Amino acid sequence: MVYNEWQRGDCTISTERARLDLHAIHEFLSTKSYWARGRSFELVQRAVENSLPFGLYRGARQIGFARVVTDYATFAWLADVYVLDEFRGEGLGKWLVEVTLSHSELQNLRRWILGTRDAHELYRHFGFVEVERPEFYMHRMDAGAASTPAPPEATGGGE
């Protein structure tokens, strides 16, 4: 599998999926993040499998993470960005976002979006702004299958 790596001092950012420590990612997201608290390991694993992941490492230890959900043509969602507390203040989060946004497969997209409660200044540095016309945007929060209506029944087709 083809992957990219970036080096800065003793830190590396890599898109190599085999290098990701899914247990460490799950631990942070499910217990320390405000946006994914309580998320199951299986859900984290599925999210990573269906995204472009960026692992941040100091030596062999994973110390941060980001992922991009995209169609690689027009749209990308930057999600689950974090750096462990003990490594903050070194510019690693800024570097992680910079590398993610500059990835060769993510250039010339029409729109990037993200959600944040506390890192507005970080993302403003990269050109993100608050939504100017929120009346154009909607979202749907789905607590789980119990609140999701059954899909319409498919009818025949094909040959």
Language-model features, listed with the residues they occupy:
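Short amphipathic alpha-helix that is part of the acyltransferase structural core
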Residues: 1-39, 149-159
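Short, basic/aromatic-enriched C-terminal tail that caps enzymatic domains
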Residues: 4-10, 129-150
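A conserved beta-strand-loop-helix scaffold within acyl/acetyltransferase catalytic domains
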Residues: 40-82
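Conserved acetyl-CoA pyrophosphate-binding loop and the N-cap/start of the following alpha-helix
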Residues: 87-96
